[in-house]
């Protein structure tokens, strides 16, 4: 018997495609003549994400912000972060954050989740022309800067500025500390836990860029930054 292959659309992130469809004025994604119909839950998740990013309204109409997001050839989350970066410093930082999130964490063995640590090391290595393990991330960051018309910045980033930009990309992952040591409640629902020794555990508010979670269980944070 021939092996059945699962069509990519059945498991892929549909947010970029849903934004493109909204850009063309189509309001009912379900009515399109799909070769393989994407799961309704995936369509719903994509729409919910785009609404939370301010890219579309609840009727699937593209917004002015959505048009700016759609103009950038990257995931809507990263595009929103770059578009909302309203200074040259923030735009350069947004490009570095996007590159860091696109690649495997160079400090994956480090238990601390602080993104600012990674970004500082990237910038110091780049400034000294000693890229080493940061070479791939530095290259991707340069591509993002070209896309965003940003300039390279190798000053140490402000931690709360990192958090602000992460929050633009992941608004549902803004998290407030709860009564448990190192515990937080996500804006989009669900709980996450930091190690008590994590440098971010002293902050009341954080923005989470990378995590692993399952329904009904406390999520594990990999990358985050503090918020004011």
Name the predicted role of every residue range.
Residues 1-228:
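Second RecA-like catalytic domain
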